[in-house]
Amino acid sequence: MTGDEFASLLGDFTLSAESGAGARFASHFTEDAVYHDYIYGPHQGRADIAHMMQNLFHRDATDYRWEMFDPVFDGRQGYAWSLSSCTSTIPQFKGRRVVIDGMSRFVLRDGLIAEYRESVNGGVAMAQLGVGPERMAKVFKRWTGWLERRPETIDYL
């Protein structure tokens, strides 16, 4: 896969995420892929990834928009900066619009995504929603646990 082909993959990847079509979104992944989402946690395999997109993302928000910028690709893994936005449908935050930026890491195998990770400042999204400080602290502790338990973090420390 070339850098241009990677950029094209990202374009279709984000359009399929915006559409909410779980199977279409999951078709970008290998059968055993893992999608590490900062809100919903890890999802493994196409069926679970499709469920996450269609039944979690699009249950909790509408008006999704996701764009990737400045993609780089070395033949095995790629990175891109992104902006994403949505409008919450969660009752206590209904109608509130959120916009966040993030960095995405893609490990590819045979032209498909084998692993996806993202790094975003979810606190910005929670502030835009009006999430209370106690709930934010609880979520931040969960995210801290995810980071500290990752094999890469353990090896690093």
Enumerate the language-model features and the residues they cover.
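Short, low-complexity N-terminal intrinsically disordered segments enriched in polar/charged residues
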Residues: 1-27, 31, 147-157
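Hydrophobic alpha-helical core bundles mediating ligand binding, dimerization, or RNAP-core interactions
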Residues: 10-17, 29, 53, 57, ...
